[in-house]
From Swiss-Prot:
Enzyme class per UniProt: lyase
Family: Belongs to the imidazoleglycerol-phosphate dehydratase family.
SUPFAM superfamilies to which the protein is assigned, alphabetical: Ribosomal protein S5 domain 2-like
GO cellular component, one term: cytoplasm
Gene that this polypeptide is encoded by: hisB
Pathway: Amino-acid biosynthesis; L-histidine biosynthesis; L-histidine from 5-phospho-alpha-D-ribose 1-diphosphate: step 6/9
Native source species: Dehalococcoides mccartyi (strain CBDB1)
Protein name, entry field: Imidazoleglycerol-phosphate dehydratase
A Pfam entry, by short name: IGPD
Length: 196
């Protein structure tokens, strides 16, 4: 099987990012964005999706940093998926974390789109603005060329809501990126191909 990996470096006047991704990893995470909560959430994505992800990033403000990491990570997923032949393609996951429950459904269709139903009681999670959770997911979906529906069903602790959401994303991505041996070498589409 061809290695499904990507390495991307991105440098702008606002951010500097170096990222590597292995879709067929073991959940190894090395995150260094300078934002501890963001590193924690990105680590959930690696650990529970069984992806090996290394990210080194810094930026002039948290909004630019989160946006550009999402953009770069989305591009890495798209690149690592290649022509998307043999993948399961569509998957969903519902994940609890104590008081909170989150659900993610996605389609690695080659068309970026995001629908969000997220609510947080506060505007900030220990220095991480909660609106950036939505922005991260939307940017990741568009750049990763996947259709993403994400929902926080309920919860009383904002940290738990966000963590359940990232874990649900990880589990759904793990399933959708998996190779189905019955589809080996074939795009999972009646069109015979998926956009990439």
């Amino acid at each position: 099987m061809t290695k499904r990996t990507a390495s991307i470096k991105r440098q702008t006047t606002e951010t500097t990012i170096s990222l590597s991704l292995n879709l067929d990893g073991t959940g190894q995470a090395d995150m260094c964005t300078g934002v501890r909560l963001f590193d924690h959430m990105l680590s959930q994505l690696a650990k529970h999706g069984l992806f090996d992800i290394n990210i080194s990033a810094n930026g002039d403000d948290i909004h630019h940093l989160v946006e550009d990491v999402a953009l770069t990570l989305g591009k890495a997923f798209n690149e690592a998926l290649g022509e998307r032949k043999g993948i399961v393609r569509m998957a969903d996951a519902t994940v609890p974390m104590d008081d909170s429950l989150a659900s993610v459904a996605l389609d690695l269709s080659g068309r970026g789109y995001a629908v969000m139903d997220l609510s947080f009681a506060k505007n900030d999670l220990t220095g991480f603005p909660t609106d950036l959770v939505r922005h991260f997911l939307e940017t990741f979906a568009i750049e990763g060329r996947l259709n993403l529906h994400a929902r926080i069903l309920y919860g009383s602790n904002d940290h738990h809501k966000a963590e359940a959401l990232f874990k649900a994303l990880a589990r759904a991505l793990d399933k959708a990126t998996s190779i189905d041996p019955r589809r080996e070498g074939v795009a999972p589409s009646t069109k015979g191909m998926l956009e990439n």
